[in-house]
Amino acid sequence: MRLFASKITVINAHRDTITKEMMYFSTVLKDCMIRKKVDTAPTNNTLNTVDYYSITIPYQDGYLSPYDYHRLPNDQMSGKWTLDTEEDLIILGEYTEPIDNDIYVKLLKRDDVGVIRSVSDNTTVPLLKHWRVIAK
């Protein structure tokens, strides 16, 4: 029985260990729960709305801690993913197109894309192992 029905795409930003260029790897994760929250934030004496996404990701294979993920050689990244608060993105839904620096910048402007801001690892509990991600 599935608890959640949404798909997300995690975009992991990784600096190539040889060329030092940015590389982007995408992983589609299924059976996630997405909740959207709209908040206000003061900016230059005005109130602006800010969208936050709270995403619950049930345990799925291939996850590595950000530290372990970034130590992997490029040829071992296939099938691996992480949740890093530095430059990683969450796309609501499935995204399978190739990503380069220009596409990454365009993705940042989309309403259905958020930068990972916090991660709560709940995979050591006996029931409902999951990660809770806040993206903005």
Which stretches of residues belong to each language-model region?
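N-terminal intrinsically disordered, low-complexity, charge/repeat-rich segments that act as generic
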Residues: M1-M23, T27-V28, K37
